């Protein structure tokens, strides 16, 4: 449930833009070499530092296995604005990854590996379903993909629904997509059983009593055949949806909103709400926060403050971010 707590407004484009702003220092305004951002890392920061249930301790006291699974449900790398990959690494004061085995790209527990593949299946099929519903993707193009054709030829598929017999109703199309989800899950279950049996025969069952007694290999995933077909469908999904005119226009607006909000907060910290500033200064109660103690120059030099700006923006919803941009930049004459 917690793996996407760190997601930004406007989805993955918001995540990428916030990561660029942090790592590149708002295009050279501050030194961004020590900063990075990715939603899986931010999810762990939320449950370790931002969300508090008592005054004595930060975070909500989740186990290492849960937090490690959250951070590794997706990749540990990201790209800068030039498309160059780099390892995501938060400042030590911002995130503690001790015991996470960051040298391994996959989760050290089977539960964490299950979350990662489940997220991959859900993201792929939900994107496809949304694209078909929004008339961005042709259902015929979707049905012609190798993965979908293979599913339609299996016993799992209801022979009562033939995609070659037009027209299919909305419910029939949805049934095919939902059936594809089941097909992918079945493939993962079967392939993972073999991988797990081979791993434990060679290495034994990990005891988890130390960082060295964990699952050193990824044992949960697709079969080789279905992996290739799922990757092919994902590439086509990107072409149909991610790079479409409609999504590109929406992404440009999202990047602009997030950039301008970040600039406003950094250049004019007093535009931040009291509860953010109070938390930065270590005050438990934002009521009556004294804004006269704020030194803009000191805040701009403090990595902790820059991380707080990032936290605040990352926690916004799409609508909140759009309204905040309006509040920051559009005069209200009413």
Where does each model-flagged region fall?
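Active-site-flanking alpha-helical
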Residues: 6, 10-19, 126
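Histidine-centered, transition-metal-coordinating active-site segments
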Residues: 13, 25-29, 36-334
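Short active-site segment of divalent metal-dependent hydrolases/proteases
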Residues: 2, 6-7, 122
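Conserved short loop/turn motifs at secondary-structure junctions
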Residues: 1-2, 31-32
């Amino acid at each position: 449930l917690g793996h996407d707590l760190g997601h930004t407004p406007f989805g993955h484009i918001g995540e990428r833009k916030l990561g660029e702003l942090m790592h590149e220092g708002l295009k050279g305004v501050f030194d961004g070499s020590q900063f990075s951002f990715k939603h899986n890392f931010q999810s762990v920061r939320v449950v370790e530092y931002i969300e508090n249930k008592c005054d004595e301790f930060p975070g909500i006291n989740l186990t290492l296995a849960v937090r490690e699974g959250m951070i590794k449900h997706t990749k540990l790398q990201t790209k800068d604005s030039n498309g160059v990959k780099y390892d995501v690494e938060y400042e030590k004061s911002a995130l503690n990854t001790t015991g996470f085995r960051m040298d391994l790209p996959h989760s050290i527990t089977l539960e964490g590996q299950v979350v990662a593949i489940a997220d991959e299946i859900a993201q792929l099929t939900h994107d496809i379903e949304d694209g078909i519903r929004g008339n961005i993707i042709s259902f015929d193009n979707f049905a012609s993909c190798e993965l979908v054709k293979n599913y339609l030829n299996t016993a799992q598929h209801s022979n009562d629904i033939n995609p070659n017999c037009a027209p299919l109703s909305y419910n029939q199309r949805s049934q095919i997509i939902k059936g594809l989800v089941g097909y992918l899950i079945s493939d993962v279950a079967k392939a993972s059983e073999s991988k797990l049996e081979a791993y434990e025969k060679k290495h034994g069952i990990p005891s988890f009593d130390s960082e060295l007694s964990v699952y050193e290999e990824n044992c949960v995933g697709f079969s080789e055949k279905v992996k290739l077909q799922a990757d092919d469908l994902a590439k086509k999904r990107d072409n149909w949806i991610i790079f479409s005119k409609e999504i590109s226009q929406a992404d440009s607006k999202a990047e602009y909103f997030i950039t301008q909000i970040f600039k406003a907060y950094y250049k004019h910290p007093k535009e931040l709400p009291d509860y953010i500033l109070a938390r930065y200064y270590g005050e438990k109660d934002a009521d009556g926060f004294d804004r006269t103690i704020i030194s803009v120059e000191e805040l701009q030099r403090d990595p902790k403050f820059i991380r707080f700006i990032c936290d605040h923006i990352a926690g916004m919803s799409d609508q909140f971010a759009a309204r905040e941009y309006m509040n920051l930049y559009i005069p209200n004459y009413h």
